[in-house]
Amino acid sequence: MKELLTPEALLTNLKDVRALTRKVIEAFPEKDLFEVNIANLRPFSAMVEEFLRVMDYLFKERFQEQHTLFLEGAFPTTKTEVLALWDRATEILDREWTKVGDYTQPLTIYQMTFSFAQWILYFIENESHHRGQGYTYLRALGIEPPFFWARESFN
């Protein structure tokens, strides 16, 4: 049976999602990235921290990274630092992706076991969901968010 989603296509999709989320981070004014929330939801920076923590956990579990992207309680406090950390995570992803090997191999994260490919799909859905919250915050601030369909690989 032919693969429905190749590792290369999965990486392209993940990187498209991450690039779009980066544009949303960039669209926020500095202060609002860390402070604005609606209906007691987290500020967008806290959602970005979640994306990076999950990615960091993946790096440690699957890629055997010997470091963490940031220490507990030490998430960046400026947009410039957040974007630099985001880019560092992307560099690690690019460097380590070819080392994954078997994308069907099970991986347990947060007491849930899925294949590596399923975890990447989970990350994509989780990030897309929370990015939608970021879009709502931007619109509430009177800022037009990036087009949700504007993926780099579509060019």
Residue ranges and their predicted role:
Residues 11-15, 19-22, 30-72, 111-155:
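Short, contiguous alpha-helical
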Residues 1-14:
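Extreme N-terminal tail/first-helix region
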Residues 76-109, 114-137:
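Acidic/histidine-rich alpha-helical segments that form the ligand environment
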Residues 6, 104-105, 144:
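Alpha-helical membrane-embedding segments
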